[in-house]
Structures are given as structure tokens and as C-alpha cells.
Amino acid sequence: MKKIIGIGVSDGIAVAKAFIIQTPQFDVKKYTNVKMTPTQAKKLLSSAFQKAKKDLEEIKTITVKNINQEAGMIFDAHIQILNDPTITEQLEQQLNKNIHPVIAVDNVFQQTALMFSEMDDKYFKERASDILDLHQRLLSYLTGVKLNDLIRIKSDVIIVANDLTPSQTATLNKKYVKGFLTESGGKTSHAAIMARSMEIPAIVGLKNITSKVEDGKTVGINGRKGIVGFDFSSKDITQWKQEKELESNFQNELKQYTNKLVKTLDGYEVIVASNIGNVKDMDLAVEYNTNGIGLFRTEFLYMSSQDWPDESVQFEAYKTVLQKAKNDLVIIRTLDIGGDKKLNYFQFPHEDNPFLGYRAIRLTLDKQAVFKTQLRALLRASDYGNLGIMFPMVATLDELVQVKQLLTKVQQEFNETKKFKLGIMIEIPSAALAADCLGKHVDFFSIGSNDLIQYSFAADRMNKNVSYLYQPLNPALLRLIKLVVEGGKLNNVWTGMCGEMASDQYAIPLLLGLGLTELSMSASSMFKARMVIAKITINECKSLVEKALKLTSDSAVRKLVENFFKKKNIFI
């Protein structure tokens, strides 16, 4: 048997025949010399848009019926993209230049997808697949090239593809499709979300998988471990089927951990909250019984607008999430734009190192009118729930003092008394080292582990050449986190975490041992986190982290935790 390792995005084990899907090919260049008046072009494009919207409504209905309401809402987002003035205006500009609709659609949607794919934030990065899904659909109507018809599958298969669009995933028949393998995609892509909703295993990030696996041959997929097996012997198939039974038992056990409140065996309560990227994500978080929102990214409000969103638009979004959370804490991060997150209506200055430049709190302190609008919306929304306001990318005490002064000024304009908790993201080493000073001015810290790791090891986590330096369990990072927690405790400030490390099951006992009281993650990760927490004691965690801090490498710490889990019979 041969094995390939990828990124598991939906748990489960399956063994079935490979069904390879080829990406549709559109010969866009042949339309370069096809003449059409702007009026004719607009009529043709309008027809394609109407067909797309009709199809998406039908796919949504099927998805809600076969999967759930939340999965269906993905296609509301697709329809919103088609109605986005930025997209429609760019297309109209091209048509007015006598560019054929096929070429115009290809230009605009490819450029938009590229913009998202180059973003560092995984949530926004993976929206590129949604744009490309619509790109394929529109080109299909305009050129007559048919899309892959997955409804015709009538036997047990594992789909193998370069990528699966959300609309393709929605039409998969769970009776026959036992899992899928793709070259592209990530944990927060809509196709991955759909797979989890359908409860079928899925693995992404499998380079050249369509050429390594033979169509019609037996393949195995272990979604939790990210393992693909092929070229099976009969013994291999028997072994995989046995593992499938164990996996099924594990998944059934996970379903026991639905309670919002979770404690360690010795009664230490841990807040397991959810990260969301927009208002609709809140519904899935509520379905998974989240204990509040540890990170609400507000960038979507700005990136989906034609201009800086006004106070009323922001207020409605914040109010809705706060109301859905009832009285649970909702931490809303102020605008974190810049770096790889750009706006169509704002020209960022050229920078050699944009990730270390004009972004997040540095930008909003400079553009105070924009910042005040957001702060006013947040203050108004604070009447509707338990609000936490969090400032990103704070590097120095001076920055924090400046931003607090601005917030106080806005409060005075409102004549408002404080109805919120105030915190900062700790994602820059200078802030971690100064936590004792910063803690005097806030109510909470939330460690942004993704950037803290990146800046601590001077390694771009999206750069494959240095990805080996993404080491969340490295003792150096654990020591930095320890400083943050201790600095907070000196000022009665609690510390949580909202980066990917918070959902890393190997990291959880270490984080609890260091003193974190809140872990925020994607909704789908919460069951596993609750399970780990419920099977350990806080004293065990403290003892474990003491040992970890004496080690010298990420791999050594990982082995330490692995042995701890074995002794505790924790199956992950």
C-alpha cells in the first residue's frame, strides 16, 4: 500500500473506488476577436447572471433539504457576490470597451479570486474558491461548455479532483459519495464546511493527487489523520475497515461533548468559544453550542462594500451577533486591514514589507474618521449584549494609550458609560514581553497565535520554503505565552487565544497548564477541544507544561504530549 499525507478537513474513514473529476477547460482566447456591441454583450451577460442566480437558488434548496440550513446559506453568499456592485461595475467597464463577455468574466473573476488567494488570513484566502465557482458557472452559460454532472454517480466512490467547488459539493449524493480528495482547498473553505456538514471524510492539499491515483481503483481516506491510501492488498483493505469501525466509535463519542460549559476532571472551567468571519457564521456557531465569540473579524464589512461602511450598516451587524449570543461574551476585533487584505476603494501605499507596515491599528489610528465610525457602531451595539472590543496588532503601550484616548473621546460624544470589556490581541513579541504594562489598561488579552508564531520565528507561515518553522509547541513560544499570562495575572486580566493553536489538541493541555482560560476556534473544532479538556485535570496540565518548558524542540514537546495522551487513553 502507498500513502500520501494531506490536510484532513472532515473526519471519518472510507474505502471505495476513485472517481476522478477533471476541471472544465474554457477556451477564453478564441473570443478575443468575436465582435459584439456593448448592448448585445450586456444582454448576454445579464442572461448568464439570471441563469446563475436561478441555479444557485435551486442548489440552495437542495442543500437545505439534504444537508442543513447553514450549508444552504453558502449559496446566499454566492448570490451576494453576483449582486456585488464592485463586480458588476468592473464587468460593465470592460463591456463598454467592446470586450467580449467571456473575456470580461474571466478577467474580473480571475483577478478577484487572485486578490483573495494572496491574502494571509485563511478565512479570506479560501473565499477564492467561491469566486472561481461562480467563474466556472458563468463561463459555462456563456460558452456552452458543460460542468461536471456529479448527480450521475450511482455507485460507492471517493471523489478525486484538483478542487471541488461549493456547488459541486452540494450536489454530491451522500449515499454514494463516501469522501473526497483534492489538491486545493483548506480547513475553512466552503467545500470543507460542506463535507463536515454531510459528515463525509475529506482531505485537501494533496499535490498532484489526480495523477497519483488511478480512476476506478480502490482508495482509502482517513480524514482525521489526513492519510490517503492506495494500491491496496486484501490485507490492507481489511485493516482499513477495522480502523473505520474504531473511527466510527470515536465520532460517536465526540457527539457527547455538546454542552456549552466544559470543565476539566478537577472542575476547572474553560471557555470554548468560536471564531466567526461574518454574521452568517454565527448561526453555525450557535448550532455547535458555542460559549460566546472569541473573535469576530470585521473585515468582511469593509471588503464587501463599495466604500467605507457607514455606522448603521456596522451597527446592524454587531447588534445581530450580540443578540444571537444572548448574554455570552462577543469579542469584536476592530478593523484589521492591510498586509494582504486590500480594499477596492482605498489605495494603500507601496510597501516592501506590507505585513510589517501600514495595517490594523496603525492604519485606523491614522484614519481616525473611519475608526470613529466603527467605534460609534460598537458603542451603540453594546446595549444589545455582552460586548468585548479588541484592538489588533498593538505593538507598544503608546499605541494602546492613543487608541484608548480616541475611544474615550467617542464615548464622551455619546455621553456613554462603559458597557463593554476592552482587550488587545497579543500577536507581536514586543506586546508579549510588555504584557505586565499593557495589562494595566485592558480587561483581557487574546493571543493571536498565527501571527505571534510568524513574527517570533521570522517565518512567513504561507511560504512553503520556511513552513517547517511554524512550530506552535516550540518551548520558546510557550515561554512567550507564559509571560503574557503572568503579565495579565498581575493586573487581574484573563488571557485567551483565538489562533489556530487554540484548536490544536496537542496544544490544549499546555495552554491550560500555562493559565489560559478561554480558547476560541472554528465551530467544527469545538467538540474535539471539549473532549480533551473533559479528560484531563488542571494539575496534570501544569505538570506537563513544566516538563515541556525544559525541552528544546517542537517535536520533543509533541512527543511528550503524545505519551501523556496514551497514558490517559485519549484518542485523537
Swiss-Prot record:
SUPFAM superfamilies: Enzyme I of the PEP:sugar phosphotransferase system HPr-binding (sub)domain (SSF47831), Phosphoenolpyruvate/pyruvate domain (SSF51621), Phosphohistidine domain (SSF52009)
Catalytic activity entry: L-histidyl-[protein] + phosphoenolpyruvate = N(pros)-phospho-L-histidyl-[protein] + pyruvate
Alphabetical UniProt keywords: Cytoplasm, Kinase, Magnesium, Metal-binding, Phosphotransferase system, Sugar transport, Transferase, Transport
Entries under PROSITE patterns matching the protein: PEP_ENZYMES_2, PEP_ENZYMES_PHOS_SITE
Keyword Kinase carried by entry: yes
Molecular function terms, GO-annotated: kinase activity; metal ion binding; phosphoenolpyruvate-protein phosphotransferase activity
Flavoprotein keyword on record: no
Subcellular location: Cytoplasm
Cystine residue pairs: none
Protein residues bound to Mg(2+): E427, D451
UniProt similarity note: Belongs to the PEP-utilizing enzyme family.
Function (record text): General (non sugar-specific) component of the phosphoenolpyruvate-dependent sugar phosphotransferase system (sugar PTS). This major carbohydrate active-transport system catalyzes the phosphorylation of incoming sugar substrates concomitantly with their translocation across the cell membrane. Enzyme I transfers the phosphoryl group from phosphoenolpyruvate (PEP) to the phosphoryl carrier protein (HPr).
Protein name per its UniProtKB record: Phosphoenolpyruvate-protein phosphotransferase
Species this protein is from: Mycoplasma genitalium (strain ATCC 33530 / DSM 19775 / NCTC 10195 / G37) (Mycoplasmoides genitalium)
